[in-house]
UniProtKB/Swiss-Prot annotation:
Gene Ontology BP annotations: L-methionine biosynthetic process from homoserine via O-succinyl-L-homoserine and cystathionine
GO cellular component, one term: cytoplasm
EC number: 2.3.1.46
Name of this chain's protein: Homoserine O-succinyltransferase
Positions contributing to substrate binding: 163, 192, 249
Cysteines paired by S-S bonds: none
Compartment list: Cytoplasm
Major localisation: cytoplasm
Length: 314
């Protein structure tokens, strides 16, 4: 089934060129199907690039998904045209009285910024608290995972001395968990962060199901037992050249970053990277939509209630 996105969104032509079924709003209105309502809170500076990456992953599902784009505030951004934001993005005041099947909160380039110093930290808290009463399942990605752990478990910000950047191997810890269905025992995923997600620390201070970890990068995937909050510390949405562009950007800014590991053939930045994480990225989002969202959400979103959710997969 397709994803339904706003007409004229730049991602439409990109996704269609990749043979991804994108449905127009007009056509979707004629189908007798209740699509899943998913809200994408895009915190990244390059919003068009990021929205396209996430829409690509949301498209690989037999479920029809109606995606709405959300911005954190109305501050102008130098990386995304104001016209694009005004045309395709909603502000929180426009959606706060509605319920949604799913919410995705993207990462943000705030790895070394303390939570209280984030310009929109108050808005983030409001939206995450709102989601408890209005969203069936929320996925927190990278920086958002750290923010979610702070707000849900009051975990302090933990950072590494050096940024983790590259493609890391992970192992799964519960092959029967719905989010891991179809996963290989070992799989790869990109990381680009300063945040530290120690498996032992999360196990000691939370009741999360720790589902996948890396010896180097730490926890990659974790979930609350009711599957209403899913934490992804890496970037399964990244395109093959995203880490490359970040590396070149940091070099040009004089940061002297370490080269992304397990990324460039022969560890040579002049060689074209090869993506080794796409299949598991698509599978993760498909499993989230199916098992955390579709199988738990009410048919009528007006019937949203805590009673709809179970603690364990049946």
């Amino acid at each position: 089934m397709p994803i339904k996105i706003p007409d004229r969104l730049p991602a439409t032509d990109i996704l269609r060129s990749e043979n991804i079924f994108v449905m127009s709003e007009a056509r979707a209105a004629t189908q007798g199907i209740r699509p899943l309502k998913v809200l994408l809170l895009n915190l990244m500076p390059k919003k068009i690039e990021t929205e396209t990456q996430f829409l690509r992953l949301l498209s690989n599902s037999p479920l029809q998904v109606d995606v709405e784009l959300l911005r954190i505030d109305n501050r102008p951004t130098k990386n995304t045209p104001t016209e694009h934001l005004d045309t395709f993005y909603r502000q929180f005041e426009m959606v706060k009285d509605r319920n949604f099947d799913g919410l995705i909160v993207t990462g943000a380039p705030l790895g070394l910024v303390q939570f209280e110093d984030v310009l929109y930290w108050e808005e983030i808290q409001v939206i995450m608290n709102w989601a408890k009463e209005h969203v069936t399942s929320t996925m927190f990605v990278c920086w958002a995972a750290q923010a979610g752990l702070k707000l849900l478990y009051d975990l302090p910000k933990r950072t590494r001395k050096e940024k983790i950047s590259g493609v890391y191997e992970h192992k799964i810890h519960d092959r029967h968990h719905p989010l891991l269905r179809g996963f290989d025992d070992l799989f790869k995923a990109p990381h680009s962060r300063y945040a530290d997600f120690s498996p032992s620390y999360l196990a000691e201070h939370t009741d999360l199901d720790i589902l996948a970890t890396s010896e180097v990068a730490g926890v990659y995937l974790a979930s609350t037992k009711d599957k209403r909050n899913v934490f992804v510390t890496g970037h399964p949405e990244y395109e093959v050249d995203t880490l490359h562009h970040e590396y070149i950007r940091d070099c040009e800014q004089g940061i002297e970053p370490n080269m992304p590991v397990n990324y460039y053939p022969d560890n040579n930045a002049s060689n074209t990277p090869v993506a080794s994480w796409r299949s598991h990225g698509h599978l993760l989002f498909s499993n989230w939509l199916n098992y955390c969202v579709y199988q738990q959400t009410p048919y009528d979103l007006d019937d949203f209630s805590e009673a709809n959710f179970t603690k364990n997969d049946e």
